[in-house]
């Protein structure tokens, strides 16, 4: 039974996205269907949590919109995701950045920058 589940998850997994870690600032293009029309909606914010593995992996992205904090839980393997772009890599010393919820203003999105060395 476990082999069957792993086989299905492997066939559904998407590998076309970059590595995403808590603290990274990402821009996610989501497909939104309204009636018969389909359009792309951008959601840009800081990854405060990632959870699960394989087909059930999700990330929580937080942004400040007109002074109000907005969080969205996004399944990484969803077919409604068009693209994920990492805008900035953040240096976080924790796996969950829930302390950002208590901050207001500019400090609510402030995470130290991380230098990224790309492997050839």
From Swiss-Prot:
Any one cellular-component term (Gene Ontology): cytosolic large ribosomal subunit
Keyword tags: Ribonucleoprotein, Ribosomal protein
InterPro entries from the UniProt entry: Ribosomal_bL19, Ribosomal_bL19_CS, Ribosomal_bL19_sf, Translation_prot_SH3-like_sf
Covalent S-S links between cysteines: none
TM ranges: none
One GO biological process term: translation
SUPFAM superfamilies reported in the protein's UniProt record: Translation proteins SH3-like domain
A molecular-function term among this protein's GO annotations: structural constituent of ribosome
Described purpose of this protein according to its UniProt entry: This protein is located at the 30S-50S ribosomal subunit interface and may play a role in the structure and function of the aminoacyl-tRNA binding site.
Family of the protein in this entry: Belongs to the bacterial ribosomal protein bL19 family.
Name this polypeptide is given: Large ribosomal subunit protein bL19
Species annotation: Chlorobium phaeobacteroides (strain DSM 266 / SMG 266 / 2430)
């Amino acid at each position: 039974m476990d082999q069957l589940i792993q086989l299905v998850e492997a066939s559904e997994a998407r590998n076309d996205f970059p590595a995403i870690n808590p603290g990274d600032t990402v821009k996610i293009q989501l497909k939104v269907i309204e009636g018969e029309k389909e359009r792309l909606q951008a959601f840009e914010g800081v990854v405060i949590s990632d959870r699960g593995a394989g087909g059930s992996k999700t990330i929580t992205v937080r942004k400040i919109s007109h002074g109000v904090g907005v969080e969205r839980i996004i399944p990484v393997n969803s077919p409604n995701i068009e693209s994920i772009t990492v805008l900035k890599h953040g240096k976080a010393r924790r796996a969950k950045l829930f302390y950002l919820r208590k901050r207001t203003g500019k400090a609510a999105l402030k995470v130290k920058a991380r230098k990224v060395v790309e492997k050839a």
